[in-house]
Amino acid sequence: SRIGCKDVSLDLWPGEVLGIVGESGSGKSTLLNMLSGRLEPSAGHVHYTAADGKVLDIHSLDEAQRRRLLRTELGFVHQHPRDGLRMSVSAGTNIGERLMANGARHYGNLRATALDWLERVEIPVQRVDDTPSQYSGGMQQRLQIARNLVTTPRLVFMDEPTGGLDVSVQARLLDLLRHLVRDMGLAVVLVTHDLAVARLLSHRLIVMYHGEVAETGLTDQVLDDPQHPYSQLLVSSILQC
């Protein structure tokens, strides 16, 4: 049987962005899903230091504990916004229900927060009552980001957040992400096949190859002076494009 990911050991610090790159089938999405608790590993542990200082084993939590953690301290931005949004309710509701899940009930405050976040992610506030299905792909992705960040999580997982977007839309979204990550002091685990995205957003980089870590280090170091033959091939293929 094929092993999706093995012999991976890593740490992540508050405010740090860790990029995971590699070709399709290299194990990067498998690793992301295990780190975020969405996929159970056959061996090993994922430890998370919560806001109260307690060290939690993500995969030892029961479903209620895991959901509570996802509501309060963790976020997950999907490659396809439809996987992370409720497409049949308004943009304001998509943002507000995350707050309601944490106990917020005052409609005026929920509405004001939703409007503030739409503005922060550069969506016209007059579109607050539109459903995501009425938005462009880029706007849907920005709404998904707002929905995740409205609860001020400490750690956000991002799976190809700019994938499938036009170049101009991608550039605006990257600029937005860079500023939000910096301003909020987020820790981020970012999966991308685009080395330009990895260079712009991540501090450290992991190169995955056949389910294993081929190389890891500071992003500029790995991309400017790759040591592993696969890393060299990956970088050179981008330079030739």
Q: Language-model segments: which ranges?
A:
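ABC ATPase NBD Q-loop/coupling interface
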Residues: 45-68, 222
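Helix-to-loop junction immediately C-terminal to a conserved catalytic motif
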Residues: 36
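Conserved ABC ATPase "signature" region
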Residues: 109-126, 235
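Conserved ABC ATPase signature
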Residues: 131-135, 139
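The feature captures the beta-strand-to-loop junction immediately N-terminal to the Walker
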Residues: 21-23
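A short, surface-exposed alpha-helical micro-motif characterized by mixed small hydrophobic
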Residues: 198-200
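ABC ATPase "signature
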Residues: 213-217
